[in-house]
Design a protein with these regions (language model features):
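Non-catalytic terminal extensions that flank enzyme cores
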Residues: 1-54, 77, 334, 347, ...
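Residue patterns forming the tRNA-binding/recognition surfaces of aminoacyl-tRNA synthetases
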Residues: 3, 8, 17, 21-25, ...
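N-terminal catalytic cores of NTP/NDP-binding nucleotidyl/phosphoryl-transfer enzymes
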Residues: 31-94, 147, 156, 216-219, ...
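Short, solvent-exposed turn/loop segments enriched in Gly/Ser/Thr/Pro and often Arg
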Residues: 34-36, 44-45, 78-91, 144-152, ...
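Alpha-helical support elements that line or immediately flank enzyme active sites
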Residues: 56-58, 281-286, 495-503, 637
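Extended active-site and interfacial segments that coordinate phosphate-rich ligands
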Residues: 57-65, 215-250, 273-280, 290-297, ...
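Secondary-structure transition/capping motifs at alpha-helix termini
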Residues: 68-76, 97-110, 130, 134-139, ...
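Feature 926 captures the class I aminoacyl-tRNA synthetase adenylation module centered on the KMSKS loop
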Residues: 202, 394-454, 458, 502-545, ...
């Protein structure tokens, strides 16, 4: 017995109630079960800085597809959700919120600010959770984590102290990204690079003791105050005689050396560059190689400091104008050339970032990177698709020490304590009782917090209880797959891998599935500035979560960007309606019937064909899923349901359903096949469209608990019917051929015809003959005659050639001869006029020589087309006699 479905599919009536039921029944929850193989993944934790965007929707849809698939395959599937504290991003948001209330962050103080930020976290983490639930994701909400919860904080502290004690963490001076507005260091991920209109200022640097000078081009003339050398390429013949000599720094009149370094591109500009080690990362490295002094000429707010002489106190851009004016006045400015160049800005406040030399906490990366490199080379870790191997290796093989300290309040505070007496620091889990250097008992904790990526790098194992040796960690770790975007391979993926090896001795996952960005219909990245962002919740509200999910996965290929627009969502909704309507038809005809498995002998070729087709589909989709070809997998399911099942088998089934009173056994047989195949198709579709499939499945098989807890379809040898697949492929070809002929001849649907099928293959003939009653409606036939020869077929019958057979349609069944001859005569007259006109145009020498070539060619093409059409019309007229 089955239940009926509502007349139309309304996601709003289903999705929320369905999700509540799943949660109440703990279907998403996983506990250690040694009798099952685990499958684990961790959610890339979204930032608590606002609403989710379409990229989050894609990322979590992909993960949910995998976790639902593995759960149905029988794995003990665990998906750990959570959110990221997002350090500076959140701090900026809360600071702005306070500003709107007229509250100054500094006046509020650290503790007061943190209290407000925790309030923000509670509000937005809950919002994000609700948004994810609307998408239908099946993560274990009982295990939801936060990168600053007690367990994660314990892991962060343990890692910092462990790395410090092993000599990997140190405090030192290096070039970092500095935001003058937020007054903190930034990670590369927090710096957006955008092309801006700027200039190259060409400046003369006199060579000491000569009347020569070097011409240097710079986009930041204000940093001239901190220059400590000029560099040229060692192989540049133009400058070999002056390497080792001194140049005079304009305006400052300080002597600086001319050094040779392979960093210089001798083909770019003049082949000579100014070196400012305290204000450029590349110059910093050159400075280290040549033992150059580092002169920082900027304050934290990007004003010039006391080392800037008369420019001290000026804003960097004010100083730039003043310095350029002075260079021009004193004859050092050669020229100013407009130049478009990339400028780094803080992604949260939009301020132009300054590369500054600062004392910060760093992680030494050379040794930590080695196991992460080896993991890829030995196959312990793989990327899907493989092309991202190169990006991963490039970053690791060129890795620099990681700046982990931030001058903000929101985040994990660095566990370093400074002696109030001697200033030395101690790294410890708790504030020390006594200074090991001077014996003082008073300490102050480091004000800085850790880079947000420091805690998220531990996510795969901190969420399972590390550093404690928990049963969860032993059973569920390492995780199986990480799903993430290609834009954070360096910032997050690499750091998780080396952290996994450093602290657990294992890779945190064995596969990284990379997806691309979601772009708009024009291929542009979605952004606030373009105003082209699409809110996934609005799409869900209008079309339902399943339609959004199907849109995001259809055509999706690992690593590739995708375009998103409403027409695609409408197509997905139409598919949902197609599935619903076909299912409703089946359920209505099952009614109160107990559909039993029929004897094999009762199965028609069409029954065996559709069973064989869904069987092959299960095998193919499983292979695609295991290769992470989720877009290909869902396309196969889509095509099967829409084409083979709905458009062919359901239509073929109608004859036996509607003649149930005449043959109850045949009706039971076809209903069993419909129920069985629909059930299999719903299972294969479920990971992609969980709500609609669950609703239909529970109506189809009400005795079962849940579709998501049912078994994934597996290939059955007893459902392999190649001969019947062959028969159905021929029937489909015959039907399509007949439909094409009828369309070409404008035969109305109400007009039925005889159909002669001539074939020599006895098995094929028998197969088709056994289905003639079912296929008559599809072919608009009133009679189907199977013959091995053409005898009895009228000479003027229209023929359709298909593999292994020829189909004939008596012409008198298709058209009224007199009406058709009259129509063809009119068409002949029209075509003759068009041919005459085109020939006249092409015979006109003036037209041929003066008109644009494309217009002349267009007339030639028309003449050729009309001539072909006229020949076809005449042939049809001759056929009609």
């Amino acid at each position: 017995m089955s239940k009926e479905l509502a007349k139309t599919y309304d996601p709003k009536q289903i999705e929320e109630k369905m999700y509540e039921k799943w949660c109440e029944n703990k279907y998403f929850h996983a506990e250690v079960d040694r009798s099952k193989k685990p499958f684990t993944t961790v959610m890339p934790p979204p930032n608590i800085t606002g609403k989710l965007h379409m990229g989050h929707a894609l990322d979590n849809t992909l993960q949910d597809i995998l976790i639902r698939y593995k759960r149905m395959e029988g794995y003990n599937a665990l998906w750990i959700p959570g959110t990221d504290h997002a350090a500076i991003s959140t701090e900026v948001k809360v600071t702005n919120q306070l500003k709107e209330e007229g509250i100054d962050k500094k006046e509020l103080g650290r503790e007061g600010f943190l209290e407000r930020t925790w309030q923000w976290k509670e509000e937005y983490a809950g919002t994000i959770e609700n948004q994810l639930k609307k998408l239908g994701i099946s993560c274990d909400w009982d295990r939801e984590r936060f990168t600053m919860d007690e367990g994660c904080s314990k892991a962060v502290e343990e890692v910092f102290i462990s790395l410090y004690e092993k000599g990997y963490i140190y405090k030192g001076s290096r070039i970092i990204n500095w935001c003058p507005k937020c007054k903190t260091s930034l990670s590369d991920a927090e710096v957006e690079h955008e092309d801006q209109d700027g200039h190259f200022w060409h400046i003369k640097y006199p060579i000491a003791g000569t009347d020569r000078f070097l011409e240097i081009a710079t986009t930041r003339p204000e940093t001239l105050l901190g220059d400590t050398a000029i560099a040229v390429h060692p192989d540049d013949e133009r400058y070999k005689d002056i390497v080792g000599k001194m140049a005079i720094l304009p305006l400052v009149n300080r002597e600086i050396p001319i050094v040779a370094d392979y960093y210089v591109d001798k083909e770019f500009g003049t082949g000579a560059v100014k070196i400012t080690p305290a204000h450029d990362p590349n110059d910093f490295e050159v400075g280290k190689r040549h033992n150059l002094p580092e002169i920082n000429i900027m304050n934290d707010d990007a004003t010039i400091n006391e080392k800037g002489g008369k420019y001290a106190g000026m804003d960097r851009y004010e100083a730039r104008k003043a310095i350029v004016a002075d260079l021009d006045e004193q004859g050092y400015l050669v020229k100013v050339v407009p130049h478009m160049h990339a400028v780094g800005t803080h992604d949260r406040c939009g301020t132009t970032v300054e590369p500054l030399i600062k004392q910060q906490w760093f992680v030494k990366m050379d040794e930590l990177a080695k196991p992460a490199i080896n993991a890829l080379k030995t196959g312990e870790l793989r990327f899907v698709p493989e092309r991202f191997d190169k990006i991963y290796l490039h970053w690791l093989e060129n890795i620099k020490d990681w700046c982990i300290s931030r001058q903000i309040w929101w985040g994990h505070r660095i566990p370093a304590y400074y002696c109030d007496e001697c200033g030395e620091f101690v790294v410890a889990r708790e504030m020390p009782e006594k200074c090991p250097h001077c014996g003082c008992t008073h300490f102050t904790q480091d004000e800085d917090t850790l880079d947000t990526w420091f805690s998220s790098a531990l996510w795969p194992f901190s969420t399972l209880g590390w550093p404690d040796k928990t049963e969860d960690l032993d059973y569920f770790y390492p995780t199986d797959v990480l799903v993430t975007g290609y834009d954070i391979i360096f910032f997050w993926v690499i750091r998780m891998v080396f952290s996994g090896y450093a602290h657990t001795g294992k890779a945190p996952f064995n596969t990284v599935l990379i997806h691309g960005l979601v772009r708009d219909s024009q291929g542009r990245k979605m952004s606030k500035s373009l105003g082209n962002g699409i809110d996934p919740l609005e799409i869900i509200d209008q079309y339902g979560a399943d339609a959004l999910r199907l849109t995001l996965i259809t055509g999706n290929a690992p690593g590739n960007d995708m375009r998103f627009y409403n027409e695609r969502v409408e197509a997905s909704r139409n598919f949902a309606n197609k599935v619903w309507n076909a299912s409703r038809f089946i359920l209505m005809n099952m009614k109160e019937n107990v559909v039993e498995k029929p004897e094999d002998a009762l199965l028609t070729p069409a029954d065996r064909w559709i069973l064989s087709a869904v069987n092959t589909l299960a095998k193919d989709v499983t292979e695609n899923m295991d290769k992470f070809e989720l877009g290909i997998a869902v396309q196969k399911v889509y095509d099967f349901i829409w084409d083979e099942f709905c458009d062919w088998y359901v239509e073929l089934a109608k004859y036996r359903i509607w003649h149930a009173e005449e043959d109850q056994a045949a009706a039971n047989c076809v209903l069993w096949v419909l129920k069985t195949v629909l059930g299999q198709a719903l299972k294969l579709l479920h990971p992609f469209m969980p709500f609609i499939t669950e609703e239909i499945y529970l109506a189809l098989v009400p005795e079962e608990e849940s579709l998501m807890m049912s078994s994934w379809p597996v290939y059955k040898e007893e459902w392999n019917f190649p001969a019947d697949e062959n028969v159905m492929e021929h029937i489909k070809a015959i039907t399509k051929g007949i439909r094409n002929v009828r369309a070409e001849m404008d035969v109305p649907n109400s007009r039925k015809t005889k159909v002669y099928v001539v074939c020599q293959d006895e098995a094929l003939c028998n197969g088709i003959e056994g289905m003639t009653e079912s296929v008559k409606p599809l072919m608009n036939a009133n009679e189907i005659i199977i013959e091995q020869t053409k005898e009895g077929v009228a000479d003027n019958a229209v023929s359709v050639v298909v593999p292994d057979a020829v189909v004939y349609l008596p012409l008198e069944d298709l058209v009224d001869f007199e009406q058709e001859l009259e129509r063809l005569k009119k068409e002949e007259d029209r075509l003759n006029k068009e041919i005459k006109r085109a020939e006249g145009m092409l015979a006109n020498e003036r037209f041929v020589s003066k008109a644009p070539a494309d217009k002349v060619q267009a007339e030639r093409d028309k003449l050729e087309k009309y001539t072909e059409m006229l020949a076809q019309v005449k042939e049809r007229m001759e056929g009609l006699g």
